[in-house]
C-alpha cells in the first residue's frame, strides 16, 4: 500500500485557485456567522441599556439617545429653576441612568428667541447646569456630565407663538458613549 503525503493529495485533487476560493469563502462565512452570535452593541451601549433608555422615554437621534428634546424638561420665561414635577422627572431619569450603568451624559440647555444672544446663552447654560445638579444628586459622576448652553439654536417650536416659545425653553439629556 502506497501512502501519499497530505500536500500531494491536495495538489492532485483540487486546482490551487479552487482551493483558495473554498478556504476564503469558508473564512468569510465564519466571520459573518460569528457576528450573529452576540447582539451588536448599539452606539456602544448594551441591549439592556438601550431598553432602559427607551423605556424611560429617550429617543434615538443623530446625537445619541436624547430625553427632553420636545419636553418635559421645560422652564418658565427667563427662569432656570426646575419646577417640582420636572425635578421628579429628572431624578427618575438619573436613577434610570445609574441603574443601567450609564454615567456619562451631556446636558443641553436652550432658550426661546426673546432677549439678547449673550444673555440667552448664559440662561441656557444655567438651565443645563440645574439639570446636571439633579443628576449628580441621584448618583451620577459630576466629572462625566458635560453641560452645554445652546441659547437660541436648534428650536423645536415656532418662536412666533407663545406655545412654541415655551417648547424652546428646555433642557435635553443626551447619552452617547462614543
Stretches with model-predicted labels:
Residues 1-64, 81, 88:
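N-terminal targeting leaders that direct proteins to extracytoplasmic destinations
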Residues 52-60, 74-108, 133-137, 173-178:
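Periplasmic peptidoglycan-binding/anchoring modules of Gram-negative envelope and division proteins
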Residues 63-65, 80, 143, 152:
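Beta-strand-connecting loop/turn residues
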Residues 65-73:
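Short, basic/glycine-rich phosphate-binding loops at helix/coil junctions
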Residues 72-74, 81, 113, 153:
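Active-site/binding-pocket entry motifs
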Residues 108-178:
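Periplasmic OmpA-like peptidoglycan-binding domain that tethers envelope proteins to the cell wall
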Amino acid at each position: 500500500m502506497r501512502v501519499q503525503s497530505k500536500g500531494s493529495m491536495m495538489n492532485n485533487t483540487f486546482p490551487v485557485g479552487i482551493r483558495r476560493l473554498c478556504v476564503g469563502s469558508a473564512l468569510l462565512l465564519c466571520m459573518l456567522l460569528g457576528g450573529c452570535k452576540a447582539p451588536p452593541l448599539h452606539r456602544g451601549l448594551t441591549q439592556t441599556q438601550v431598553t432602559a433608555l427607551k423605556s424611560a422615554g429617550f429617543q434615538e437621534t443623530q446625537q445619541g439617545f436624547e430625553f427632553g428634546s420636545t419636553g418635559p424638561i421645560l422652564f418658565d420665561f427667563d427662569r432656570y429653576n426646575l419646577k417640582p414635577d420636572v425635578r421628579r422627572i429628572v431624578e427618575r431619569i438619573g436613577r434610570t441612568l445609574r441603574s443601567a450603568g450609564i454615567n456619562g451624559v451631556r446636558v443641553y440647555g436652550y432658550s426661546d428667541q426673546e432677549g439678547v444672544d449673550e444673555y440667552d446663552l448664559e440662561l441656557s447654560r444655567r438651565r443645563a447646569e440645574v439639570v446636571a445638579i439633579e443628576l449628580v444628586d441621584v448618583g451620577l459622576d459630576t466629572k462625566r456630565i458635560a453641560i452645554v448652553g445652546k441659547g437660541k439654536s436648534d428650536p423645536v417650536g415656532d418662536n412666533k407663538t407663545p406655545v412654541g416659545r415655551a417648547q424652546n425653553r428646555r433642557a435635553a439629556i443626551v447619552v452617547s458613549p462614543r
